[in-house]
Amino acid sequence: MKLNNIILSAILLTSASVADDITVKQEGVKYIKMLGGTLKNKLQSEMKSDKTGVGAVTFCTNEATKITAEVNSKLPAYAKVRRTAIKLRNFEKNGADDLDMKIMKEYIASIEAKTFTPKDIKVVEDGDVTRVYKPLLAKQVCLICHGSKISKAIQEEITKGYPHDKAVNFEENSLRGVIVAEIKKH
């Protein structure tokens, strides 16, 4: 009986440790969901409370960077998460590097070739850092602020917060950008 208990305990301990060992991809996706989910929920709340969309622009201008910093403060020291795009609204905070641009161009090519799936998570080794990329597609609601027919009130708010804005003229289901988790080897 004691032998059975010892064997059962060993199996349970092994199972628990295997369950705790998540892959870098899974870890990155977890952090991406933390940022993406928080931003999406708060933005949707703004859109519900102000149907004009002006409040959403104000929210993005004043809160998106703060929320990104808050999410990053909850991550382990070896990890961070951020957003970027080819056509940016906030150049100073969300600029893309060469690797980001390469990945986004690959996503665009797969969209054009009709081989794209929104669940296409890319994992790229970059020195001692692994980057996990999740694509962000422009949904119909996004076009209120990122499309080609932006209301005057929204455009004024965008221009006030982002005088060098390039994040416009998207079409539904085009690549809006990516969320990137960067995880250092540890």
Task: Mark where each language-model region is.
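Extracytoplasmic c-type cytochrome modules immediately beyond a signal peptide or single-pass transmembrane anchor
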Residues: 19-139, 153-186
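Hydrophobic h-region of N-terminal signal peptides that target proteins for export
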Residues: 10-19
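Sec-dependent signal peptide recognition
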Residues: 2-9
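The canonical Cys-X-X-Cys-His
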Residues: 139-149
